[in-house]
Amino acid sequence: MGGEKAFSFIFLLFLCFFLANLSASSAHPPRQKLKQRIPCKQLVLYFHDVVYNGHNKANATASIVGAPQGADLVKLAGENHFGNVVVFDDPITLDNNFHSPPVGRAQGLYVYDKKDTFHSWLSFSFTLNTTMHQGTLIFMGADPILIKNRDITVVGGTGDFFMARGIATIATDSYEGEVYFRLKVDIKLYECW
C-alpha cells in the first residue's frame, strides 16, 4: 500500500507540473518579432494657428467657441485652459514660414480636457489642393501638449488619400503665448489605395 500511495503522489505531482507548464506556455506564446512596416506615403506639413484674442480679428484663424462657466470666449480659461473648445481654419504650408503660400487648410477643433496639465483632444482634417496632392486627411487623438513629439491617428481620407490610415507625429514648432502656435505634422500613411 505504501508503494501505491507514493506512486499516486508522484503521478499527481507530475500531472500538476505538466498542466502548469502547459497553461503557462499557452498563456504566453513565444513573442514573434513585429514586422517593421514601411509607410506607403509620407508628408511633412506645418499648420499655423492664430487664436482670436479680441484684438486680432483680421489675422485670427481660430476662435474659442466653448468655455467653462465664468470664463469668456475671448481669453483661454485658467492655468491649463480646461474646458475650452476651440475651432480653427488654419493655413497649411510646406515650410515653417507663416507667410509661405498655403497648400491647404487645417479645419477642426481641439478641446482642452485635463485640469492638471496642458492636454487636448484633437479632431481635424487637412484639405490639400495642390498639383502634388488633392484630397483630405482626417486626424483624431489625444495631444499631451507638453511632450515634444506626440502621435495622433490618421483615420481616413479622400481623393489622393482615399481610405488612408496611419500615424501623424506632431510637434509644437513655435509658440507665442496664447495667441499663436505652429505645429509640424509628420504624416506616415501605412494603408494607401
Curated annotation (Swiss-Prot):
Signal peptide (from-to): 1-29
Upper classification of the organism: Eukaryota, Viridiplantae, Streptophyta, Embryophyta, Tracheophyta
Any one GO MF annotation of this record: dirigent protein activity
GO-annotated biological processes: phenylpropanoid biosynthetic process; response to jasmonic acid; response to UV; response to wounding
Gene Ontology cellular-component annotations: apoplast
Pathway the protein acts in: Aromatic compound metabolism; phenylpropanoid biosynthesis
Keyword Cell division in record: no
Subcellular location: Secreted, Extracellular space, Apoplast
Sequence similarity: Belongs to the plant dirigent protein family.
Keywords: Apoplast, Disulfide bond, Glycoprotein, Secreted, Signal
Function: Dirigent proteins impart stereoselectivity on the phenoxy radical-coupling reaction, yielding optically active lignans from two molecules of coniferyl alcohol in the biosynthesis of lignans, flavonolignans, and alkaloids and thus plays a central role in plant secondary metabolism. Also involved in the biosynthesis of etoposide, a chemotherapeutic compound of the topoisomerase inhibitor family.
Disulfide bridges in this chain: 40-192
Organism: Sinopodophyllum hexandrum
Residue ranges of coiled coil: none
Oligomer and partners: Homodimer.
Record protein name field: Dirigent protein
Annotated tissue distribution: Expressed in rhizomes, stems, and leaves.
Usage in biotechnology: Combinatorially expression of Sinopodophyllum hexandrum (mayapple) genes of the podophyllotoxin pathway (e.g. DIR, PLR, SDH, CYP719A23, OMT3, CYP71CU1, OMT1, 2-ODD, CYP71BE54 and CYP82D61) in Nicotiana benthamiana (tobacco) results in the production of the chemotherapeutic compound etoposide.
Transmembrane helix recorded as keyword: no
Induction: Transiently induced after wounding and by jasmonic acid (MeJA). After an exposition to UV-light, first transiently induced before fading out.
